[in-house]
């Protein structure tokens, strides 16, 4: 037995040597320039530049200062907001309108936790976002450092992927991976955490580690050795890819093409056949149809070429313009209950489709979606797809259009039966007239909310470039019946999460993407309270929006049903606050200054006494926007029963 001991010891020594070499080989062969002035924030900025990031939304913090400074040097426009949630909302808007990845950077701890709602909203809206978060230094993680929490565990359920940069050399590959994953498959948010010492220069980090130049004891010597080893591992080979000079294009950064599921030719051929046999077809197009790689304008043409009734939801509102004959907005439930072919192009059977209960069970139901889970959501309960196509929705619509018009010449003259279209048109015109008549009646006090929205539709949104941002409950829900987005990507709403507070951030991102457009934020008075502070951001960065607030001094969407069900409106009341003055003050104006008219400061109050001025106020607000000034039109509206019973449970 004892004769085996030398062999066991030798084996253990060999194993230990192999283990140490495996663990340390990357450090051993790496080099470190202790005199380098470069810092990790420069590498972050280079990756952003390589991925065509034009805007970086942030609220400053010491953990992320190197990123912000380096981004500015790379001519990336750094937009500092008043709340971290608005930074993510703005990045979300940029990703939706530009087809690129939106990027936000926030500091550690509360800076990051303030974004939770906005990140979850982006996840459910399928918006590709890269969120850069500061963090405590690696040495101090879990030791009570300032703003140190387990950020990755908190955000893992909210993101497609979350990762931590542990050393400078990992910055470029990890960020490139983040951009790739954000756009691949079903898009969504990703989080990259940067410990503070990965972003600052070597000399500064070494200084803060307080390495002793003359250790007096074995403990100090060991501590010095450990700190030097940590420092070496942190920076070794970190700048093998040299940071670019300001304005220089980073050519060494790899940019991967995202992986996107494509619809099969067989499934498209099946859909063509189903469409050719249908007598009462209808297509419901939603946000996923507007994702890259197919441009939204091309998707619009493909949908038009189908020549069948279309309902547009989410970001797809406005896809076919304001008055296309195939677009219907009202009585969708009635249409879906009698249609014999229902194509859900990016739409899913969640609460917006009453979980599938509104679909005709005898109809052939075709659903197209990138996400396998969304394809079959609630299909085991209320509905069942006849054909489920997993793939990019825009590509599927493109292939369907080509197949219907080119690959199958016998179907090129396909037309939807006129009786079916006539039935839908009759319902559409009837409902439009009902709404118009409802907008004409004025209460004794305050204003009919429908008349405000009617004027906004006909006197406010006067140009094709207008963008509508929807942020609210009851007033915004009414707006969806009246306002007609002017073209593709001209409507922004939170999506299925139903988030309040998106208005300021969405408007900021929209105006930066489309500086020539007038951006209108349709606010409820409750939701306006979340993001009016961003009027300060808009003024500072010359990215103005026009806010139209339906102010009924109430959380009306909740109060209406709560009062009816329980006889109490507790916690639903608000004040008739002068939000117009609040917005003007945030924008840097002094609305109480006697030398300046209230309207010239961007503050417009509309009551029953001056309702006739609303059209002029809207024109004045557009003029202010053209001069780079944001404004608020605060409309004191009356309670309305227009959307009674609309609460979703």
UniProtKB/Swiss-Prot annotation:
Its EC number is 4.1.2.-. Gene3D superfamilies: 3.40.50.970, TPP-binding domain. Its cofactor is Mg(2+); thiamine diphosphate. InterPro entries: DHS-like_NAD/FAD-binding_dom (IPR029035), THDP-binding (IPR029061), Thiamin_PyroP_enz_cen_dom (IPR012000), Thiamin_PyroP_enz_TPP-bd_dom (IPR012001), TPP-bd_CS (IPR000399), TPP_enz (IPR045229), TPP_enzyme_TPP-bd (IPR011766). It is a single-pass membrane protein. Disulfide bonds: none annotated. Binds 1 Mg(2+) ion per subunit. Binds 1 thiamine pyrophosphate per subunit. It catalyses: 2-hydroxyoctadecanoyl-CoA = heptadecanal + formyl-CoA; (2R)-hydroxyhexadecanoyl-CoA = pentadecanal + formyl-CoA. Its main location: endoplasmic reticulum. One of its GO terms (cellular component) is acetolactate synthase complex. It is an enzyme of class 4 (lyase). Thiamine diphosphate binds at residue 84. One of its GO terms (biological process) is L-valine biosynthetic process. Keywords: Endoplasmic reticulum, Fatty acid metabolism, Lipid metabolism, Lyase, Magnesium, Membrane, Metal-binding, Thiamine pyrophosphate, Transmembrane, Transmembrane helix. Residues 474-554 are annotated as: Thiamine pyrophosphate binding. Pfam families: TPP_enzyme_C, TPP_enzyme_M, TPP_enzyme_N. Endoplasmic reticulum 2-OH acyl-CoA lyase involved in the cleavage (C1 removal) reaction in the fatty acid alpha-oxydation in a thiamine pyrophosphate (TPP)-dependent manner. Involved in the phytosphingosine degradation pathway. Belongs to the TPP enzyme family. This is 2-hydroxyacyl-CoA lyase 2. The gene is ilvbl.
């Amino acid at each position: 037995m004892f004769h085996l001991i030398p062999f066991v010891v030798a084996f253990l020594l060999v194993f230990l040597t192999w283990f140490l070499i495996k663990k340390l080989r990357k450090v051993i062969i790496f080099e470190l320039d202790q005199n380098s002035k470069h810092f990790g924030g420069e590498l972050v900025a280079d990756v952003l530049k390589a991925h065509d990031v034009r805007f970086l939304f942030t609220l400053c913090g010491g953990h992320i200062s190197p990123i912000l400074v380096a981004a500015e040097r790379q001519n990336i426009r750094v937009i500092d907001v008043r709340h971290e949630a608005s930074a993510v909302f703005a990045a979300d808007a940029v990703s939706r309108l530009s087809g690129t990845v939106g990027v936000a950077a926030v500091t550690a701890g509360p800076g990051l936790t303030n974004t939770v709602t906005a990140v979850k909203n982006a996840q459910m809206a399928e918006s590709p976002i890269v969120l850069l978060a500061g963090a405590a230094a690696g040495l101090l993680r879990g030791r009570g450092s300032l703003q140190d929490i387990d950020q990755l565990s908190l955000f893992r359920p909210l993101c497609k992927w979350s990762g931590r940069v542990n050393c400078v050399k990992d910055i470029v590959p990890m960020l490139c991976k983040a951009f790739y994953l954000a756009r691949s498959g079903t898009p969504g948010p990703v989080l990259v955490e940067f410990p503070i010492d990965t972003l600052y220069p070597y000399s500064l980090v070494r200084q803060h580690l307080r390495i002793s130049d003359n250790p007096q004891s074995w403990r100090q010597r060991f501590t010095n050795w450990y700190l030097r080893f940590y420092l070496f591992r942190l920076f070794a080979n970190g700048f093998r890819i040299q940071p670019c000079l300001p304005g220089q294009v980073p050519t060494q950064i790899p940019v991967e093409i995202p992986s996107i599921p494509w619809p099969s030719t067989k499934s498209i051929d099946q859909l063509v056949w189903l469409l050719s046999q249908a007598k009462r077809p209808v297509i419901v197009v939603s946000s996923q149809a507007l994702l890259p790689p197919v441009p939204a304008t091309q998707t619009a043409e493909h949908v038009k070429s189908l020549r069948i009734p279309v309902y547009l939801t989410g970001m797809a509102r406005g896809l076919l313009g304001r008055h296309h004959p195939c677009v219907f907005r009202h009585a969708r439930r009635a249409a879906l209950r009698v249609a014999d072919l229902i194509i859900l192009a990016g739409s899913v059977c969640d609460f917006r489709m009453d979980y599938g209960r509104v679909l005709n069970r005898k109809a052939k139901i075709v659903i197209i979606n990138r996400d396998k889970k969304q394809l079959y959501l609630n299909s085991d309960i209320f509905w069942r797809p006849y054909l489920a196509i997993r793939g990019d929705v825009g590509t599927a619509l493109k292939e369907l259009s080509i197949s219907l018009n080119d690959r199958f010449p016998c179907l090129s003259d396909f037309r939807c039966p006129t009786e079916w279209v006539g039935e839908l048109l009759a319902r559409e015109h009837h409902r439009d007239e009902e709404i118009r008549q409802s907008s004409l009646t004025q209460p004794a006090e305050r204003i009919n909310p429908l008349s405000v929205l009617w004027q906004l539709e006909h006197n406010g949104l006067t140009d094709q470039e207008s963008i509508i941002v929807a942020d609210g409950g009851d007033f915004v829900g009414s707006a969806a019946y009246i306002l007609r987005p002017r073209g593709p990507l001209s409507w922004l709403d939170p999506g299925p999460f139903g988030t309040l507070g998106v208005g300021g951030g969405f408007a900021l991102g929209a105006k930066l993407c489309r500086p020539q457009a007038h951006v209108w934020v349709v606010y409820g008075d409750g939701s306006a309270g979340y993001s009016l502070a961003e009027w300060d951001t808009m003024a500072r960065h010359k990215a103005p929006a026009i806010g139209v607030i339906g102010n009924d001094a109430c959380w009306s969407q909740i109060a209406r049903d709560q009062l009816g069900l329980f006889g109490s409106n507790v916690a639903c009341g608000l004040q008739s606050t002068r939000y117009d003055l609040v917005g003007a003050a945030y924008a840097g104006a002094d609305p109480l200054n006697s030398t300046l008219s209230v309207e010239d400061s961007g503050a417009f109050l509309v009551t029953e006494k001056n309702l006739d001025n609303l059209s002029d106020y809207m024109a004045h607000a557009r003029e202010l926007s053209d001069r780079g000034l944001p404004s608020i039109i605060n409309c004191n509206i009356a309670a309305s029963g227009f959307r009674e019973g609309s609460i979703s449970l």
